[in-house]
Amino acid sequence: MSSTFEQAAADVKELKETPNSDELLKLYALFKQATVGDNNTEKPGLLDLKGKFKWNAWEELKGKSKEDAASEYISFVDELKTKYGMK
């Protein structure tokens, strides 16, 4: 991982406010795609709603390269820093 990506991952924890649910899902999916690659995990069970949302968000990025996901993650964190500010 690039130092820029690692800094973005650290910065997101220092936002003044917690991003909304959709933003958190996007952050999660981009982070997983950038660090792991395509989702190859089993789909969560019917009662695990949070797990299913996270799994689906990551699954939607299937085929995106780790590099592209990392770049998109960095850009998205920059948007969130502008929107929410830093602590």
From Swiss-Prot:
One CC-aspect GO term: cytosol
Span of domain ACB: 1-86
Pfam families, sorted: ACBP
Disulfide bond positions: none
Primary location group: cytoplasm
Any one Gene Ontology BP term: very long-chain fatty acid biosynthetic process
Protein task: Binds medium- and long-chain acyl-CoA esters with very high affinity and may function as an intracellular carrier of acyl-CoA esters. May enhance the activity of the ceramide synthase complex.
Protein's name in the database: Putative acyl-CoA-binding protein
InterPro entries from the UniProt entry: Acyl-CoA-binding_protein, Acyl-CoA-binding_sf, FERM/acyl-CoA-bd_prot_sf
Family recorded in the similarity comment: Belongs to the ACBP family.
Leader sequence residues: none
Residues at which an acyl-CoA binds: K13, Y28, A29, L30, F31, K32, K50, K54, Y73
Source species, domain of life: Eukaryota
GO MF terms, alphabetically ordered: long-chain fatty acyl-CoA binding
